[in-house]
């Protein structure tokens, strides 16, 4: 530890982020991980790809850190044929994610001005409809798992 930073012993670099994974629907020891991350100002990104709908202490996995990442690939508990989402309570990250995932378009009279490299990470309507229908039945899918 140096200046209240957590240091990687092999690289001697400051650990800036941690990405714990909730595997097969089972929450990891997120309380312990979050406590360490909070103590050393480490950014916490949860990999909740395999735990959509899982709860830990009555709170959804993916909602303990700064950002939670979820997957809707074909092998997950609910699927849209692909895609995923992130969840956050941080307004800055929410706006940044939306901006980047919608081609980084900014309001402009030509309607095609971009302020940075953007991506088209939006689900097609058909895939989104499939996902929405499954989200409504998420509890049933979890009970049958």
Sequence positions of predicted segments:
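Active-site phosphate-binding strand-loop segment of PLP-dependent enzymes
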Residues: 1-80, 85-87, 92
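Active-site region of PLP-dependent enzymes
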Residues: 51-57, 64-144
